[in-house]
Structures are given as structure tokens and as C-alpha cells.
Design a protein with these regions (language model features):
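Positively charged n-region of N-terminal signal peptides that target proteins for export
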Residues: 1-6, 21
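C-terminal motif of bacterial Sec signal peptides marking the signal peptidase cleavage site
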Residues: 16-19
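N-terminal low-complexity, Pro/Thr/Ser-rich intrinsically disordered segments
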Residues: 33, 37-85, 96
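Active-site beta->alpha N-cap acidic-glycine motif
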Residues: 79-286
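Generic hydrophobic/packing signal
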Residues: 6, 27, 33, 49, ...
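Bacterial lipoprotein signal-peptidase II cleavage site
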Residues: 21-28
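Sec-dependent, cleavable N-terminal signal peptides
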Residues: 5-14
Length: 287
């Protein structure tokens, strides 16, 4: 709005402006009196202002554990045909004082959820016990039998010697409205550094952007600090119910009242969540 106002005033003062390309130009200082009439049109168009440098995405390698690598960088990979364990999580509690306040949701949260501290201890425990993350899609492959019917085939995994494979999955990654007041984060966002962060409000109502309060960002951070926990780049499988959108973005149409304003907001939310999904997929998360 400021740029439009400045251009309008400049035109009234008969200041000659030269535009170049579609990149926004720095606004010239306001001129008054005779100074404006003496302004000369520049011989050449001004250089476009440089766009802010976008953060460089950290390289992230995703590979398959079904390939026999032998020994790489001193790590020997051996076949694993045993049980592949699975840990399943609901959204984790960022603020226990809001979750366990005695309201109607408190008991259910206590039964089904874990807190940030408990989640961190679980990650450290499975890491210390020699587990490594694998993608469920690498454990099984879809095929067809002699009758043309789809069947699932168990794959042989090749994992670092002495390690055990583990699958993580997460349910209800929608950030439902009813949970927001009960101590959970509100949504996932893409930070200026190109990484995934969580957004929410603390018990005092202050906005908080963090990587220490949400299951997704905590695991991302843990893997960055312990890359051997995910030798193939896998993180976890995110399950969406389709109710109230995805990842905290209200992309849904399941509402009793609908109008053009709601549809415009829904489309805006759809566009906003796309880069979040792309970055999650790029860094080892599946849906």
C-alpha cells in the first residue's frame, strides 16, 4: 500500500519514473516545490533490486535398506529378516499444564498421548538400544500372485550390523481445533532457514515458534544430532484423517456453512501447506 501511495504522489508531482521488469524498485525520496520540476529522466533504467536470497536447502539423502552395501565407511550392512518393530504416536503434549487441567479432555489425553519430555526420552531410549529408522514402504513391496491378485511381499533389509529396524508412525496430524486449547501446537510452518518449525501459543497466549514442542520437529532435530539413527534417511509415516484439513491448515470443506470467503481461505490454506508437504517428503517423511 505504501508503494502505491508513493507512486501516486510522484505522478501528481510529475516525477518521471522508469520501471524495469517485474521486480519492485526502491521508492525514491519524496520531492516538493521546484525540485520536482527539475528532476531529469535518467538515461538508463535503474538496476532491479536484488531479491532476498532464499535459504539453501540442506542436502538430504534417502536410500533403500533393501540394497546390500557390504561395508561402507567402516560400517558393515547385514541382512535382517526378523521382526520389524513399530512405534505409533498421537500428537504430543507441548504444555502439560493445559492438557491436564481437569477438563473433559484430560483423561483421554493422558490415556493416548505422551508429553514432549516423554517423547524425547522414548527417542533416546530406542536410539540407545540400537534401533534405526526404516521406511515402512521399504519393508514390504506390493506384487501380484499367479491369479493376478495383489499381494504384499516382505523384503530383506540390509542394516548396519548390530542394529535393529524400527518404524515410526503418527496419527491425527491434522491439529484439530478442539486440541489447540489443550496444550498442543497449532501447525507446522516453514522457517526462514528452510527447516520445518511448529507454531502455537504458550499458556500465557504468546506466539511460540519452536523445534522442541512438536513430534515432527523434535524427530527432525534428533536425527540431525544423531544421523546414525536414520542411516537411510527415513523419519516416519504421517497419517491424516481428512477431518479439519492437514498439518494445521484448514483445507477441508466439512462445515455446515459455506460461502465464498471460506472457499477463498481454503484455497489459500491449500497453497500455504504445499511447501510444508514438499519439505517433509524431501526429508524422509511419508504420508
Amino acid at each position: 500500500m505504501r508503494r502505491i501511495t508513493t507512486l501516486f504522489l510522484a505522478l501528481l508531482l510529475t516525477l518521471s519514473l522508469t520501471a524495469c521488469g517485474s521486480t519492485a524498485q526502491p521508492n525514491p525520496p519524496a520531492q516538493t516545490g521546484n525540485d520536482a520540476s527539475q528532476t531529469e529522466t535518467p538515461d538508463t533504467a535503474p538496476e532491479p533490486a536484488e531479491e532476498p536470497e532464499k535459504p539453501q536447502q540442506e542436502p538430504y539423502v534417502i536410500s533403500s535398506p533393501t540394497v546390500d552395501r557390504g561395508t561402507v565407511d567402516g560400517v558393515t550392512y547385514v541382512p535382517w529378516d526378523g521382526v520389524v518393530e513399530h512405534l505409533f504416536f498421537h500428537p504430543i503434549v507441548a504444555y502439560p499444564e493445559l492438557a491436564f487441567d481437569g477438563d473433559s479432555q484430560a483423561d483421554g489425553i493422558d490415556d493416548w498421548m505422551v508429553t514432549v519430555d516423554e517423547y524425547g526420552k522414548i527417542l533416546q531410549s530406542v536410539y540407545d538400544r540400537g534401533y534405526v529408522l526404516v521406511d515402512i514402504n521399504d519393508v514390504w513391496s506390493e506384487s501380484t500372485d499367479a491369479n493376478g491378485q495383489p499381494v504384499m511381499i516382505r523384503n530383506t533389509l540390509y542394516i548396519p550390523e548390530g542394529k535393529k529396524p524400527l518404524i515410526f508412525s503418527y496419527d491425527d496430524v491434522n491439529y484439530y481445533d478442539y486440541m489447540l486449547k489443550d496444550g498442543f501446537t497449532y501447525k507446522l510452518i516453514l522457517g526462514e532457514d528452510g527447516l520445518i518449525w511448529s507454531y502455537g501459543l504458550d499458556p500465557q497466549g504468546n506466539e511460540v515458534i519452536s523445534q522442541d514442542l512438536d513430534a515432527v520437529t523434535i524427530l527432525d532435530k534428533f536425527v540431525r544430532e544423531h544421523p546414525d539413527f536414520s542411516p537411510f534417511g527415513a523419519k516416519g509415516s504421517l497419517s491424516l484423517t481428512g477431518y479439519q484439513g492437514i498439518l494445521g491448515y484448514r483445507t477441508n470443506t466439512d462445515t455446515k456453512v459455506w460461502n465464498d470467503e471460506l472457499e477463498a481461505n481454503r484455497l489459500k490454506e491449500c497453497e500455504a501447506v504445499k511447501p510444508i508437504i514438499a519439505e517433509l517428503k524431501r526429508t524422509g517423511w511419508t504420508f
